[in-house]
Amino acid sequence: MNGVFLAIGALLPICLAGGALLGYAAVRFRVQGDPVAEQVNALLPQTQCGQCGYPGCKPYAEAIAAGDKINKCPPGGEATIRALADLLDLEPEPLDAAEETPPRVAYIREAECIGCTKCIQACPVDAIVGAARLMHTVIADECTGCDLCLEPCPVDCIEMRETPDDVRHWKWPQPSPRLIASDRERAA
């Protein structure tokens, strides 16, 4: 009986020290959030537009980290899809869009604008400039075409317009493989 108390007395301090060490390590080396979701979120464009089907970029990043598709972000486009594929070691996929829509930007009819600033507050990328009770305008190069400024406008003076074709978003048609092969044969 005396040996049992001796064994308990010897093991109890060792167990308490080990438990305290594990408790300290759990607090000291705790990982905040999901590191993969944080890395994915850093690659997304942070427009918070909801075009991916999620209420913002962070929920979409968490969904990607949980296994959702990486090709649902129209503002990020192909460059974001390639970066996400490299990060997650996946194959890049084409952008998942219901139909290919031309790029659009918001346009404010300044004569109708009352300067309420609701569109400025709604814009996730600060592409709208103006001041209270003064007309507002859109910086077209900054606008992602997310449509978030349309809803809060009380006088409906904002519309989405297609951007004119220029070198920034011009798409050349892909050559057909047959044409390329025939050109090689003629050159040889």
From Swiss-Prot:
Query: What EC number(s) does the entry state?
Result: 7.-.-.-
**Which residue numbers delimit the 4Fe-4S domain?**
32-90
Highest taxon listed in the record's lineage: Bacteria
Q: Which residues bind [4Fe-4S] cluster 3?
A: C123, C143, C146, C149
Keywords of this entry: 4Fe-4S, Cell inner membrane, Cell membrane, Electron transport, Iron, Iron-sulfur, Membrane, Metal-binding, Repeat, Translocase, Transport
Write out the annotated subcellular location. Cell inner membrane
Write out the residues that bind [4Fe-4S] cluster 1: C49, C52, C57, C73
Q: What does this protein do?
A: Part of a membrane-bound complex that couples electron transfer with translocation of ions across the membrane.
- Similarity annotation: Belongs to the 4Fe4S bacterial-type ferredoxin family. RnfB subfamily.
Q: What is this protein called?
A: Ion-translocating oxidoreductase complex subunit B
The lineage, from the top, is: Bacteria, Pseudomonadati, Pseudomonadota, Gammaproteobacteria, Pseudomonadales
